[in-house]
Structures are given as C-alpha cells and as structure tokens.
UniProtKB/Swiss-Prot annotation:
One of its GO terms (cellular component) is cytoplasm. The modification N6-(pyridoxal phosphate)lysine is found at residue 269. This is Glutamate-1-semialdehyde 2,1-aminomutase. Its EC number is 5.4.3.8. The gene is hemL. The lineage of its organism: Bacteria, Bacillati, Bacillota, Clostridia, Eubacteriales. Keywords: Chlorophyll biosynthesis, Cytoplasm, Isomerase, Porphyrin biosynthesis, Pyridoxal phosphate. Pfam families: Aminotran_3. GO terms for biological process: chlorophyll biosynthetic process; protoporphyrinogen IX biosynthetic process.
Amino acid sequence: MSRMYDRSEQLFAEAKTLIPGGVNSPVRAFKSVGRNPVFIERAEGAYLYDVDGNKYVDYVGSWGPMIVGHAHPEVSEALKAAIDRGTSYGAPTELESRLAKLILEAFPAMDMVRMVNSGTEATMSALRLARGYTGRSKIVKFEGCYHGHADSLLIKAGSGALTLGVPTSPGVPANIANNTITAPYNDLETLKAIFQEAGDDIAAIIIEGVPGNMGVVPPAPGYLQGVRELTRQYGALMIVDEVMSGFRVDFGGAQTLYGVEPDLTCLGKIIGGGLPVGAYGGKAEIMEKVSPAGPIYQAGTLSGNPLAMTAGIITLEILKRPGTYAALDEKAAYLADGLAKAAEKAGVPVWTNRVGSMLTGFFTDRPVVDFASACTSDTAAFGTYFRAMLDRGVYLACSQFEAAFLSLAMTKEDLDFTIAAAEEAFQVVAAERAKA
C-alpha cells in the first residue's frame, strides 16, 4: 500500500528513550500485531489523523469512551467554556451532582455514586468497600475479565477452581494473590463449587457486564442471574464492572440489558466523554460506609474535576436522545454482517460476537464463550488482518482480544468503506495461510 509512516517511526524511536516501551499504556505499542504504533495528531467525528497525514475510520474510540464521535461540537463547546472557568478547584461543584443524577437515573441499582479518576480506581475502591462492608477478605474474579491494574485483580487461576491465585505481574505480593479466587467465565457450576467451599470468606464477586478484554464474550442466558443468586445466598456482594459496557450496550448498561441488579457498579470511559474519569456506586446502605460519611477511606485530588464532569454531562445528554441506541445497534449489525460475509468469501474462519455497538471477530472456527475458547484464536492471522486494515485506512484495536467500538458519528459510507477494506484484508490473510 502507498501509506507512509516515517514520522510515526521517528516519534516512536524518540518516545522509547523517554517513556517505558515508548507508550503510557502497554497495548498501544502494537507488540501483538507485529509492527510499531502510529502516532495520532488529531481526531474528528469517526476519524483519526496520524502525524504522516493518514486518515483512518476509528473503531478504537479511545478504547470505548468516544461513543458520540471525536470532538463532538456540543462536547467541545462546553469544554471550551469550562476551561475558561478554571480547570480544577479541589472543591465541590454543582457539575458533580448533575452528572451523578444522570448516572443514577440510568442505573436503578444505584442510590449513590462516588466519582474517581479511572476505571482502575473505581474497581479498586469498590473492592475495598465490599471488604469493609462484609468484613471478609476474599474476592472472586473471572478468567479473561479485566478490571484494571490493581494488585488484587492482576491474578490468574492455578490448576483447579480453588488453587491459590498466582500473580500475573511481578510486584504483586503472594499474600494479596491468595485472597483472589479466579473462576472460568460462563461456568455457573464451578462457581457454585467455589462458594460451597469458601463462600463464608468471600466478600464479593467482580464481573464485567460484558467482557471485552478477552474480546467480546456475552454472558450466557441466565448466567448473571445465577451469579446474583449465589452472592445473595452466601452474603457476598455482586460488583458489576461496567467501565466498558456502561452507557455503551444500553443507556443503563449491561445490567439493564440483561436484567440483573448488582450491589455495586463500576463505571468509567463514556461518563467522562473522553476525559479521565471513573465512578462506583450502589445502594445507600453500602455507599454510606464510604468516607466522610463512613469509615471506609477513599479520596482523589482530581476526582469530580469540572472538565470531566462537563464532558460527561453533555455526552450522556446526547445519549439520552430518542433512537440513539437503536441507531448504534443497526450500524453494528450491518458492520458485523458485512465483515462475516467478507471472511466467508475469503475462506477465513472467523467467529463474531457482538453486544450492541461493541464486537469482536475471533479468528477461530468455534464458538467463543469463555477465555479458553477465545484462546483458540489464530493471533498471527489477526496480526496480518490488522496490518492490512491499517494500511487501508481502518484503525482497529491492536489485539485479537479487544473489542471494536462504533460511534454515532459513523456513516453507512464509513461502514461500507470498512467492509470493502476487510474483503481485501481477509484475502491477504488467506494468501498468507496458503504459503504456510
């Protein structure tokens, strides 16, 4: 292809001398797709523009937040006015209550919400609250579900449901890992066995509303309800991590879509309209344990800052408009169907999972229902596909195990452009496989 990436290559070489790995979040380095990253100069609507002048249809959307599109005029106008009033006060503002009201309106399971600065802060704080509220220490998480980089959540399972957790990163102490039990996702029977053995010690289950960091893997019918029943039976809390799915798959997130009421909910991404933000909330009797109302400490210098609150308010007000989610779902269904047909035409096996406007095409010929089945994907083939799509002006998540996100800014022309690019990219994959 005729695209050039010289300036991106220069900037990445420089960045590696200044920043670990040249990036401030590991996935951005493009390591798993066999090339160096492109450096972005600006974004508008459905598009990214890199420093070499290349334009891309963007399906990363800053890893989910940009659901209304980049530099949306209403969001940008409100932010410019907010900047002129000062960027941070370290004091309460009406904006915090306005955003809180919008969130509580969308999530009936929440009576109160606390703003923080990231999804990691939200999940970390929710776990501390769950432990403080229940007086228990252990938590259960699920294979393939990602909840940020807090120590107790960077854990993988050993061989067997109740094997002591093993850290997946150096620097996570064993005594912290020992309090995290990892279970297979979408497997209610194994979860029941875990609770039968350790239920009296479990403070909480934390689960993604729609897992997106092993690729998109929907919960099986009745699975979330089964998890909810187990936690109630044993007096543990159910924490639903909706950092990715909140306001994405439905205005009320996955819990509204699937009809489940958790004790605590974690949010992020979309509620900041592209600015750093997080939140956690739940029933008043639990949330009133958070300081200064209660004894469980949590704080943040920039929590509830006026810029993130402003962007979040405008974004959620846009999303509340009639027909928003029907339009997103229609676009995503059209794209998923077109991509599936393109893969079939090229003879490349791809299994597509989609929930609302988030989807993943797994390079495998079997259904993907959990982490183990996601891992049957041909990651080398995905890398070939990713590079071919990038060269054709389509910016995808640079990992097989991530979601593609659609935005309201995308047009049918953008989707058709993407499908046409995919038809060529799948042919490249097929040709590479034929050589092997």
